[in-house]
Amino acid sequence: VINGMSGAGRIELDNQAAKSRFYISGDNSSFTGELVASGLNNNPGSTNDARDLQFATAASMGRGTLTLNGRGFWMDAVNTADTAVMATINVLEKGTYLNGGSGKSYYFGGAFTGSGTVTTALGDAFAYLTGDMTGFHGAFTRTGNALFTWAFGNNTAATLNDGKLFGDGVVLKADGGTSLFKFSYT
């Protein structure tokens, strides 16, 4: 359990035992450093080997960078556009897995960077991604058997780099179930 982070340094979470998770709570909005979670789990979110990060709220994620390399993450509390995650999500080659409760929607207002795959098996849910996507070169995908919507923008202004919304090579796909990819920019 981590309850309270602040400052601009780097926190690297150690590998943990299978079927365990780090629980991070409190309002960590003053944390502007980097929280790194990488290691053993090459199948983030696997029920046989869950080693994910559980955040109490969007504010528990801080306002720095969350670097994920083979670790899943989720939030206890559903957030809104007004309480969006403001941390930068940096996804490395082993990828990450958005876990949580089906039927819930999550809002991410921070940037996405890196070249890994962000996947989820959540059903009947939305992930609103309203931050800068120009530094992201990976993939957004969905596994499972229900509908999931990746919503880029939420009637918000788009950040573009040389006219591009994403970095080169981004892939939007459904590996199972049904994925919708919506774009809503002003």
Language model: regions and residue ranges:
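Beta-strand-rich extracellular passenger or scaffold domains
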Residues: 1-186
